[in-house]
Amino acid sequence: GMRVKILEGMALGRVVVTTSMGLEGIDAQHLKEVFLADTVESFVEAIALCRQDATFARKISEQARNFILRHY
């Protein structure tokens, strides 16, 4: 089924960290519109990257919102 929470987060311009399974059916790309994290370590890395590089995190969130506007 459709991943409504992920799409809602993207539409709101939030940084989305999800698993590969959570992203199934959504053509967003890792490090472009979302962060993919399939292990605890990769979740921690994604969160740390967002905290360390707010500009990059903002870019991902803006691209996520634009993705939703283009595709949904």
Predicted segment positions?
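A short, well-ordered alpha-helix in the C-terminal region of glycosyltransferases
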Residues: 49, 56-70
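A structural signal for short secondary-structure junctions
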Residues: 10-11, 28-29, 61
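Short hydrophobic beta-strand element within catalytic cores of glycosyltransferases
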Residues: 5-8, 15-19
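Short glycine-rich, flexible loops that bind phosphorylated cofactors or substrates
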Residues: 1-2, 25
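Residue-level signal for the nucleotide or nucleotide-sugar donor/cofactor binding architecture
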Residues: 4, 38-39, 52, 72
